[in-house]
UniProtKB/Swiss-Prot annotation:
Stored InterPro entries: Ribosomal_bL20 (IPR005813), RIBOSOMAL_L20_CS (IPR049946), Ribosomal_protein_bL20_C (IPR035566)
Record gene name: rplT
GO molecular function terms noted in the UniProt entry: rRNA binding; structural constituent of ribosome
Protein name, entry field: Large ribosomal subunit protein bL20
Membrane-crossing residue ranges in chain numbering: none
Family: Belongs to the bacterial ribosomal protein bL20 family.
């Protein structure tokens, strides 16, 4: 079997790894082995966090909806329950966008949800006893 010299291929491989690890700190951007290890970790973190990002956005939307709902004297839980009872199919992303950009429309949705909710006997009344 013929001998294979890897000089050019090895140089190209090292160059691509070092180019990809340009912004890393210390040896991780200068030494091939450290750069390769860091690149493996970085790709793993990127893969993991692309999935985690979806949950983080959902948390953000829920906290925005809750803040806007409480400004309209209803909790997030009761708002979602009322919207489901009223048959309004709007996802949390669009609901959060409405809460931020169009408060009047959000208030209208809150009124629809409030009308669809059954009257809660344990809820405190508006009158002082």
């Amino acid at each position: 079997m013929a001998r294979v010299k890897r000089a050019l291929n090895a140089q190209k491989k090292r160059r691509t790894v070092l180019k990809a690890s340009k912004g890393y700190r210390g040896q991780r951007s200068r030494l091939y082995r450290k750069a390769k290890e860091q690149q493996l970790h970085s790709l793993t973190y990127a893969y993991r966090d692309r999935r985690a990002r979806k949950g983080e956005f959902r948390k953000l939307w829920i906290s925005r909806i809750n803040a806007a709902a409480r400004a309209n004297d209803i909790t997030y839980n009761r708002l979602i329950q009322g919207l489901k009872a009223a048959g309004v199919e709007v996802d949390r992303k669009n609901l959060a966008e409405l809460a931020v950009s169009d408060p009047a429309a959000f208030t209208a949705l809150v009124d629809v949800a409030r009308a669809a909710l059954p009257e809660d006997v344990n809820a405190p009344s508006g009158e002082a006893a």
